[in-house]
Curated annotation (Swiss-Prot), chain B:
Membrane topology: Lipid-anchor
Modified-residue entries (N-acetylalanine), positions: 2
Keyword Flavoprotein in annotation: no
Post-translational modification summary for this protein: Serotonylation of Gln-67 by TGM2 during activation and aggregation of platelets leads to constitutive activation of GTPase activity.
Free-text note on domains in this protein's UniProt record: Switch 1, switch 2 and the interswitch regions are characteristic of Rab GTPases and mediate the interactions with Rab downstream effectors. The switch regions undergo conformational changes upon nucleotide binding which drives interaction with specific sets of effector proteins, with most effectors only binding to GTP-bound Rab.
Protein name (database record): Ras-related protein Rab-4B
Keyword entries, A-Z: Acetylation, Cell membrane, Endosome, GTP-binding, Hydrolase, Lipoprotein, Magnesium, Membrane, Metal-binding, Methylation, Nucleotide-binding, Phosphoprotein, Prenylation, Protein transport, Transport
EC number annotated for this UniProt entry: 3.6.5.2
Assembly with partners or alone: Interacts (GTP-bound form) with RUFY1; the interaction allows endosomal tethering and fusion.
Keyword Oxidoreductase among record annotations: no
Length: 585, 213
């Protein structure tokens, strides 16, 4: 069809142009178009025809008319086809970035669909230098990992170890991570201790919780306790600087004080955490004696902050920069209080305070950490509590790892969903340091899916193109129903790598394939799993003429009822389909 | 499978994280407390047909994620909601303090006429209360909200909250204050024929044009 069309194309374009120098037969056909008489004989009443139509049918050579109609039809078909081809090529260029162009088949060499077995893995471990990374990954991609060896294989898939590492190198990697984890743990636990201390002072008795907002005390309390943004409004009372109570008398759960010594010099100073104290409503002091030194502290701190807790990978710079090194930033009290002149005695006390405060954290940091701890606690408590692994001690481990990661990424902070991503890793690895390291690697990709990461919209756009190319019927249906070209029904799928859509055992199977796919077929394999989910239910979606709402509801109800192996198979086939499409262009 | 109802209302459940939104919904739909509830990602969903003032109304309830970070996502579900449960936790002042922001979102993104009921959840945890009934009812009054204290655990006032909201919407339809026909009202007529009416319109659009020129 194509060659015929292109040879005729010149004529078609001429017809569409309707230039002034038209040949006679064109004029005639133009006349017929102008009066729209092609249908007048069939459409309008026979009596009306002669009066309204300038070209009487029997005066026109019928053959010419047919010819003109034929050309027009062909022209339309051609332009439709051309537009479609252009569109297709655009989409193809777009899609070609989604898959690897080199196809790695399951059957060459055979046996990949059996997955990565214990046998193969032990052979690899004996002779790691001579084993091809790609071959192992191919087996994972087509058949998954035998459950028994997941614990050993996952750190490789996630990048904690590299394939081909010797035993010694692996040990080195482990000890580096262990040291780092220990340090981070100590850092945030020290900070947590200060946060808790501050909270205790903000809420000395249950009845003070009722704040009507009218008294200054409760106002202050609210600011101290709730407000995480306006650090300059937090008041500090000098008079509260009593020696700290011995930990034994405290009513709260014991703080991990013993951890403090483990940190680097910068954090060891947090042993003096009690020095930062805040005005509490029941301090019994007139509020006029409170004065704001925070802004002064803040600016001094900002200057004295050149030394941060930079990570070797530079990942945590933002988050840890809030920590104040034990430098003598406050050796000279700054003129921070606007009431300085009238309050000489307090200024003296202020100098004292400032001296003690050298060892502390910025208010901002404390607020941020308090907020994040609060959120993490809320979510960890309810994370997968129906799964056998998550007993209270294991939930505590989950929390420690989560807090450590968040401490290193305080600029982003904890976002709901992170727990979901960490939980399966901890279940399989059952080792805190390893889970921490693997989670950090996993989050390099996943963090972009979280709000403001920008990847989610790209996923939606890619889904749209993929459905358009691979299932045009469904695409038309979606297009008609308008709304759900936004693909919000996939939101949770992408955010959590399908973790909530599948049973735990299936999550393991799907995740490892996603990680291996990156090197075998597609860096965006999640798209194809999503597409596979849509395809698996396409008849139901189509026959029920589902709209956006129906689809969200449908997939919510189907959660944990999918056949993961079938979905993976469809997904692999879809990748292959796109690869073939691109190859054959 | 085929349900008959007079109206369909789109409802939202909004409020800060951990206030018990999903548990309220679950209690309303299943009549029991959801022990192992996990935090909501994106949106979850429930629907139930209720009888209000002699009319059968299908409530289509959208349960949203609480963390502010997801607000931009949650907002995409707001459109065309007729009613909302605005939930805070009586044992957490923080959740109470953010009510105004949630309310603004609901009124600007869903509809200015959205019928909102304020729910002070976790009523069963009275000893840990941080927000008094009086304070919250004052807030409700100032912002023209209905108000109930609820407990998703015991089920107290849960059904009442949804029904009260539905009843108010029905009253507003009766009085002409709300027009179900208006786009984005969050209200649909229930009879199946109306839904099918929408189809021929798109069928017409793709029908061949009578004239080839």
């Amino acid at each position: 069809m194509a060659p015929f069309l292109s040879s005729d194309a010149g004529d078609m374009i001429e017809m569409q142009g309707f230039g002034p120098s038209l040949p006679a037969w064109h004029l005639e056909s133009l006349c017929s178009q102008g009066s729209s008489c092609l249908f007048c004989s069939t459409r309008s009443s026979p009596y009306a025809t002669p009066s309204r139509c300038s070209c009487v049918p029997d005066r026109l050579p019928l053959r010419l008319l047919c010819e003109s109609m034929k050309r027009q039809i062909v022209a339309r078909a051609f332009y439709g086809w051309l537009a479609y081809c252009r569109h297709l090529s655009t989409v193809r260029t777009h899609l070609s970035a989604l898959v690897r162009h080199h196809i790695i088949p399951p059957a060459r060499p055979p046996g990949a669909s059996g997955g990565l077995t214990k046998d193969v893995w032990s052979k690899y471990q004996k002779d790691e230098k001579n084993y091809k990374e790609l071959e192992l990954l191919r087996q994972v991609y087509y058949g998954g990992v035998e459950h028994e060896i997941r614990k050993d294989v996952w750190p490789f898939l996630l990048g904690h170890y590299k394939f081909g590492m010797s035993k010694k190198e692996m040990e080195q990697a482990d000890s580096a991570v262990a040291a780092r984890y220990k340090r981070v743990l100590a850092e945030w636990k020290a900070c947590e201790a200060v946060v808790r201390q501050r909270e205790r002072e903000a809420q000395p008795a249950p009845f003070t919780k009722f704040s009507s907002g009218s008294s200054i005390d409760s106002h202050v309390q609210r600011l101290v306790h709730r407000d995480s943004t306006i650090s300059n409004d937090v008041f500090i009372s000098v008079d509260d600087l009593e020696p700290p109570e011995p930990p034994g008398t405290e009513d709260c759960r014991p703080e991990p004080e013993q951890e403090l010594g483990a940190g680097p010099p910068g954090t060891a100073v947090a042993g003096r955490q009690q020095s930062v104290e805040f005005d509490s409503p029941d301090s019994g002091l007139p509020s006029s004696r409170n004065y704001s030194v925070t802004s002064g502290i803040q600016s001094s701190i900002d200057e004295g902050q050149s030394m941060g807790f930079e990570e070797e990978d530079g990942g945590g710079e933002e988050g840890s920069s809030g920590l104040v090194p034990a430098a003598g930033a406050f050796s000279e009290p700054r003129d921070a209080s606007p009431h300085k002149a009238s309050r000489a005695s307090e200024l003296e006390a202020g100098a004292e305070l400032v001296a003690v405060c050298t060892a502390a954290y910025t208010i901002e940091l404390l607020d941020t950490m308090a907020l994040n701890l609060h959120r993490i606690d809320k979510d960890v408590q309810r994370c997968d509590r129906n799964y056998w692994y998550f007993t209270p001690p294991n939930l505590e481990r989950l929390r420690d790892i989560m807090c450590s990661y968040v401490w290193e990424h305080l600029d982003v902070g904890y976002v709901q969903g992170m727990c979901d991503l960490l939980a399966p890793l901890l279940v399989i690895l059952d080792n805190d340091q390893l889970a921490y390291s693997c989670f950090s690697h996993l989050m390099k990709r996943m963090s972009q899916n979280f709000p403001n990461g920008g990847a989610m919209d790209t996923h939606f756009a890619n889904m749209r193109s993929l459905i358009q190319i691979l299932d045009s019927e469904l695409f038309e249906l979606m297009h008609q129903n308008g709304d759900y070209t936004h693909f919000y029904f996939c939101y949770r799928w992408f955010l959590l790598d399908f973790k909530r859509e599948l049973l735990y055992e299936d999550v393991f199977a799907v995740w490892e394939v996603i990680w291996a796919a990156r090197h075998i077929s597609s860096e965006h394999f999640v798209l194809f799993i999503a597409l596979a989910l849509v395809e698996a239910y396409r008849e139901i979606i189509r026959d029920n003429n589902m709209d956006f709402t129906d689809i969200i509801k449908f997939f919510n109800e189907r959660a944990e009822h999918h056949d993961a192996q079938e979905i993976l198979q469809i997904a692999r086939e879809l990748v292959h389909k796109v690869q073939m499409l691109i190859e054959n262009k | 499978m085929a349900e008959t109802y007079d109206f369909l209302f789109k409802f939202l459940v909004i409020g800060s994280a951990g206030t018990g939104k999903s548990c309220l919904l679950h209690q309303f739909i299943e009549n029991k407390f959801k022990q192992d509830s996990n935090h909501t990602i994106g949106v979850e969903f429930g629907s139930r047909v209720v009888n209000v003032g002699g009319k059968t109304v299908k409530l289509q309830i959208w349960d949203t994620a609480g963390q502010e970070r997801f607000r931009s996502v949650t907002r995409s579900y707001y459109r065309g909601a007729a009613g909302a449960l605005l939930v805070y936790d009586i044992t957490s002042r923080e959740t109470y303090n953010s009510l105004a922001a949630w309310l603004t979102d609901a009124r600007t993104l869903a509809s200015p006429n959205i019928v909102v009921i304020l729910c002070g959840n976790k009523k069963d945890l009275d000893p840990e209360r941080e927000v008094t009934f009086l304070e919250a009812s004052r807030f409700a009054q100032e912002n023209e909200l209905m108000f109930l204290e609820t407990s998703a655990l015991t089920g107290e006032n849960v059904e009442e909250a949804f029904l009260k909201c539905a009843r108010t919407i029905l009253n507003k339809i009766d009085s002409g204050e709300l027009d179900p026909e208006r786009m984005g009202s969050g209200i649909q007529y229930g009879d199946a024929s109306l839904r099918q009416l929408r189809q021929p319109r798109s069928a017409q659009a793709v029908a061949p044009q009578p004239c080839g020129c």
